[in-house]
């Protein structure tokens, strides 16, 4: 039962992703697209390839009318570029125009902050009974400034958000479908662990303090 609960969110994410690629989807979803525009994306096989995929494959072929979509670009910090409900080809053209305007020139790459932002914006729509497609497209090269809580460099960024993520490699970048439910599972596990520790501590018998030794009474000599 626990295994089934753990696999369910990841399986739902995979099935949504499969339907997107298969062109068989008829039910609109919420799409959160985060695009890496840092300088490392200027390298061969990165942004030019990523741009073509986002523009010609994802936006043009994998979205349907009724989809709600928000597009962000990120480097040091994420920036919202466009948010709309797709109702016509004109709306699709608006998204493509925004994607065409992205230039990979950001000095830093704070992937941790980008992931936090995805989680925050999807939380605002979590109760609308729509499936969520959370996409991060990046080379995973992390280089955050000293002002970031994720400061430092990582050749391939590691995060709890990415543990159950589905990664598809394209040339020298990755299409990553995120499972943000892992955030809630980690928090729940931490709370349960704390409760277990607290309960175990409360059941421990209180140690009895050792009895104090009485000092010998002084008896004056009668001699």
Swiss-Prot record:
CDD domains: vWFA
Gene3D superfamilies the UniProt entry points to: von Willebrand factor, type A domain
Ranges where the record places region Disordered: 199-223
Matches recorded under SMART domains: VWA
Domain VWFA: 30-204
Superkingdom as given in the UniProt entry: Bacteria
InterPro entries named in the record: VWF_A (IPR002035), vWFA_dom_sf (IPR036465)
Signal peptide segment: 1-22
Keywords: Signal
Name under which the protein is recorded: Uncharacterized protein TP_0750
């Amino acid at each position: 039962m626990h295994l089934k609960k753990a696999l369910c969110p990841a399986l739902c994410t995979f099935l949504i992703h499969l339907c997107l690629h298969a062109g068989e989807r008829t039910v609109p979803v919420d799409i959160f697209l985060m695009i890496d525009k840092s300088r490392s994306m200027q390298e061969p096989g990165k942004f030019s390839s990523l741009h073509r995929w986002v523009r010609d494959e994802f936006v043009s072929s994998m979205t349907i009318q009724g989809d709600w979509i928000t597009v962000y670009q990120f480097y040091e910090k994420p920036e919202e570029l466009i948010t709309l409900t797709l109702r016509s080809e004109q709306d699709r053209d608006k998204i493509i125009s925004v994607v065409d305007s992205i230039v990979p020139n950001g000095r830093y790459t704070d992937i941790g902050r980008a992931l936090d932002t995805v989680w925050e914006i999807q939380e605002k729509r979590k109760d609308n009974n729509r499936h969520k497609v959370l996409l991060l497209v990046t080379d995973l090269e992390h280089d955050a400034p000293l002002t970031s809580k994720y400061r430092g460099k990582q050749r391939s960024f590691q995060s709890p958000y990415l543990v159950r993520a589905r990664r598809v490699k394209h040339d020298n970048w990755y299409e990553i479908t995120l499972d943000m439910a892992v955030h809630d599972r980690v928090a729940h596990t931490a709370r349960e662990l704390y409760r277990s520790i607290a309960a175990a501590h409360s059941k421990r018998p209180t140690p009895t303090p050792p009895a104090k030794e009485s000092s010998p009474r002084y008896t004056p000599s009668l001699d």
